[in-house]
């Protein structure tokens, strides 16, 4: 394996491990019941989460974003999770935003360095539109599936250009392998799909 591919695989493994830890942490927070707040697009909670993160560490940068509650067809979810990394402290902190407030703010006790997402990424609604146009709609209609998760990160699922920031949308259906759709977060184009 070449040095570049080995480095990519190592970084991808670290990012995926952090994403799993982040998801498990947020899964422990109860989901909204009756009176669920209105959903909002991923970018709508970014300013609040970024302000909180930069009060925690002035060099904090967004490295990962994921829906914490169901996301609808327009790209809105009642709660989104934002993970920040501070290079100076070599620590991560997660913020879960719902209804214009921070619901969770906790350090992630895992050591890893992850690249920040690039500026100018498309919002969750545009990512869904691209994924649905390419493969998501067909999967939903043919397999009775639904969009269960979407996450924004850099360098985990694009082996050709690993420094790109991408949205990864995961569609699930009963008794079927999941469908993964990777959307370039700058161009809004599908870069890759696979079942697994």
Where are each of the predicted segments found?
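Bacterial N-terminal signal peptides that target proteins for export
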Residues: 2-18
């Amino acid at each position: 394996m070449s040095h570049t591919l080995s480095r990519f695989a190592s970084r991808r493994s670290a990012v995926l491990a952090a994403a799993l830890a982040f998801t498990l942490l947020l899964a422990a927070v109860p989901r909204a019941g009756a009176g669920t707040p209105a959903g909002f697009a991923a970018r709508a909670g970014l300013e609040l989460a970024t302000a909180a993160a930069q009060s925690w560490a002035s060099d904090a940068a967004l490295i990962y974003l994921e829906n914490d509650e169901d996301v609808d067809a327009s790209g809105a979810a009642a709660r989104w999770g934002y993970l920040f990394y501070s290079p100076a402290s070599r620590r991560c902190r997660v913020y879960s935003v719902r209804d214009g407030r921070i619901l969770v703010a906790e350090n992630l006790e895992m050591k890893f360095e992850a690249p920040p997402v690039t500026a100018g990424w498309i919002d969750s609604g545009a990512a869904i539109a691209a994924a649905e146009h390419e493969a998501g709609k067909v999967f939903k209609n043919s397999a009775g599936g639904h969009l269960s998760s979407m996450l924004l990160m850099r360098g985990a699922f694009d082996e050709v250009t690993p420094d790109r920031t991408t949205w990864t949308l995961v569609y699930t259906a009963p008794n079927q392998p999941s469908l993964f759709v990777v959307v370039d977060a700058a161009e809004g184009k599908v870069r890759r799909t696979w079942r697994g």
